[in-house]
Amino acid sequence: MKNFCLLLACLCVCSVFSCYAQSIMPGKEWKDTDGNPINAHGGGVLYHDGTYYWYGEYKGEHTYRSPGVDWDCYRTEAGGVSCYSSKDLYNWKFEGIVLEPDTLNPHSDIHPSMVIERPKVIYNDETGKFVMWMHIDSYNYWKAAAGVAVSDSPTGKFTYLRSMHPNGQISRDMTLFKDDDGKAYHIYSSEGNATLYISLLTDDYLDHSGTYTRNFPNKFRDAPAIFKRNGISYMVTSGCTGWDPNEAEYAVAESILGPWKAVENPCRGKDADKTFYGQSTFILPVNGKKDGYIMMFDKWNKTNLIDSRYIWLPIVFEGENLTIPWMEAWNLDNMDFRFVGENRK
């Protein structure tokens, strides 16, 4: 009887642990710890005090095409910015809507009729504040501004401050980068999406310092994602084709502000010329893992945006060059990536 009870207990423990994910499956439905699909699109991840925080666009259930717009301007009502937390990068707990839409003021930047895209959060060590920047736009994408919000906690609530046209230029697809020296940069597409700007933020991260560079002029590079390794800065971008996929490109520089040198498409494998039907959004350094960087893509479903999926893939280095090989499934193993399932194709 004792052995039977012990066996039963072991089976129960195994059953409990089987509920938790132990691998990442790019492009498949990814559910949170409550069993609901993760809703954090165009997002980025902050690592703070031993926990990862994933912020993203909270998409509504109804996708529609904005009236009077002559391109595939599909959207949902702006649902604010969501946050999920994780200790292991596999299992994510929903922390709620940390930047809530302003449903009462139709003139607000964050009213549901507006566009809130590509939120990114960084922590300011001097002020102790969590600072969020995002792309703010009107329903027809004519406003093309950058918005900023602040919080005392990584799980909010964030207080929306204002929007602006940084350095007198429009701002659309964007990311943030915090350097080793504590300086932070806002990287965004501008000049009608033709040129990428890299702007140094003020010490409190709440405004632009006036120092900026223009990069890849008239190349229409979009959706920037950036990281730094061994003193070299890397940036992955997409082309500019709306919701539709295109070929990624990566570039390198000795300084965040440039000059940047375009290299090639880093993707390898099936549908590499379409970035595996994804678009870059963020590059996630894995804490405690040498050369552990995860390339985060969104796999957009433009006619049902809430069902857009996530493609997370490990970056592989060959000297100073990087590649992003397609894998059906993979997981983290000590200091290296271990590939599982049917992978390199």
Model-derived features: positions:
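Bacterial Sec-dependent N-terminal signal peptides
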Residues: M1-S23
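Carbohydrate-active catalytic/glycan-binding domains of CAZyme proteins
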Residues: Y20-K345
